[in-house]
Amino acid sequence: MNDPKQIEKLYKLIAAGEGFNPNSPLGSMMVETQALTKKFAVISFFGAVEKRELDMIKTFVEKGEIDINVKNLVPQGLILTRPTTALGIAIAQGNSEEVIKYLLANGADPKLAFDDFKKSANIDGINQLIKIAPDMIACRKKYMNLNN
């Protein structure tokens, strides 16, 4: 879209609050920018968890921009080599109890982390999770069969 008249027309439509079409060149660029912003937010959220930055974690969670149970699809390779949730990363790193308790209090699902630890045969992670989330003890027998 290099035609100045088309660009001017588009600007006028946008200024009037009309004409947003996600399939148009500008619309698709805006949609792509939103997707990249979301990806950056998720990567930053996991970075905050890895660095134990509780204030930054709170910022992401309180703004509601992040699903607290989203999986990190690009593992950093520091501790885990498989995708896992923020809670799984926090536990695997031996993160501060304050961070772990905050994640749990704000909806982090311990069963997801438990399943991730089971898949990677991370017994230390499983045991740590059971200490932190005692309700997981009831699930322990079912999930401890690591051959399934």
Swiss-Prot record:
ANK repeat start-end pairs: 82-115
Keyword Glycoprotein among record annotations: no
Keywords recorded for this protein, A-Z: ANK repeat
Gene3D superfamilies associated with the record: Ankyrin repeat-containing domain
Keyword GTP-binding: no
Highest taxon above the source species: Bacteria
A Pfam cross-reference name: Ank_3
Protein name, entry field: Putative ankyrin repeat protein RF_1158
Organism of provenance: Rickettsia felis (strain ATCC VR-1525 / URRWXCal2)
UniProt lineage: Bacteria, Pseudomonadati, Pseudomonadota, Alphaproteobacteria, Rickettsiales
